[in-house]
Amino acid sequence: MPREKGRKVVASNRKARHDYSILDTYEAGMALTGTEVKSLRAGRASLVDAFAQERNGELYLHGMHIPEYVQGTWTNHEPRRTRKLLLNRIEIDRLIGKTRESGLTIVPLQVYFSDGWAKVEIGVAKGKKSYDKRQDLAKRDAQREIARAAGRRGKGMAD
């Protein structure tokens, strides 16, 4: 069977972009079992409350939920197990160095298949304060109103 091409998004962490300001992003592979891959291909995953953490010089993804594969038997995986992230040593060292700074953490942003391989997009993030979140919402609403008004003007409708 030929390998699929392109990028197929399985799950995205929209809350991460709301709660954190993303400073830098990386693409990492994941060490998965067979039933985890089958469950991901079925589009079943959740990144809510997931984060990456350093242990013994490696990065691990905690809290990501991949439900058990429906047709799986005794070989099924544990849904919230810790999964190893596959990165180059230079990238791992750079990420570990950044997380040692105060207030920075690593959060997963998306899980997707890239040319048949399961990947996770991780971001180095700094937590937002509540007033930052309110400002972002106000900016987004203002942009939406501007776009709506421009659309009406383009269609010849009066405000």
Swiss-Prot record:
SUPFAM superfamilies: Small protein B (SmpB). Keywords: Cytoplasm, RNA-binding. The keyword Cytoplasm applies. Its main location: cytoplasm. CDD domains: SmpB (cd09294). It is found in: Cytoplasm. GO terms for molecular function: RNA binding. One of its GO terms (cellular component) is cytosol. It comes from the Bacteria. One of its GO terms (biological process) is trans-translation. Pfam families: SmpB. InterPro entries: SmpB (IPR023620), SsrA-bd_prot (IPR000037), SsrA-bd_prot_CS (IPR020081). The keyword Cytoplasm applies. Required for rescue of stalled ribosomes mediated by trans-translation. Binds to transfer-messenger RNA (tmRNA), required for stable association of tmRNA with ribosomes. tmRNA and SmpB together mimic tRNA shape, replacing the anticodon stem-loop with SmpB. tmRNA is encoded by the ssrA gene; the 2 termini fold to resemble tRNA(Ala) and it encodes a 'tag peptide', a short internal open reading frame. During trans-translation Ala-aminoacylated tmRNA acts like a tRNA, entering the A-site of stalled ribosomes, displacing the stalled mRNA. Belongs to the SmpB family. This is SsrA-binding protein.
